[in-house]
């Protein structure tokens, strides 16, 4: 059965703040939990959280949430390595995947649903929301682009597909 998946990127080292941003409090929970809650309250059917540098800490926080997780052994190679880890985790028959940064709790379920609707109505394989002439999140990638994602060089980003 084809499904819409979310890939939540939570493998980074959080060096800039000195403390993992995803574990900071936000609206009565942590930032990563708010991201998960927003995804769960959307039309997304399955979710995988990509873990890395602080996997033990994040796993403790998200343990009771109905999400799957995978571990990116090469998280130091950057965000694209985490995206690829998430895509490797997806079943072969998924319909599309939305890529979410694990530290952006303000991506509402409504925004996610609009991206999914645009995908289904347009027939396009890649959908990226734009706000104020700036590209945003979540980026939706159809299963037909799975191989292209897996072949991207580390220096390239997903935006090269869009």
Show where each model-derived region lies.
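A general structural motif
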Residues: 1-3, 44, 94, 123-124
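N-terminal glycine-rich phosphate-binding loop and ensuing alpha1 helix
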Residues: 2-51, 56-58
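Residues at secondary-structure transition points
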Residues: 18-21, 26-30, 49, 53, ...
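Conserved N-terminal catalytic core of the sugar/cofactor nucleotidyltransferase
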Residues: 33-96, 162
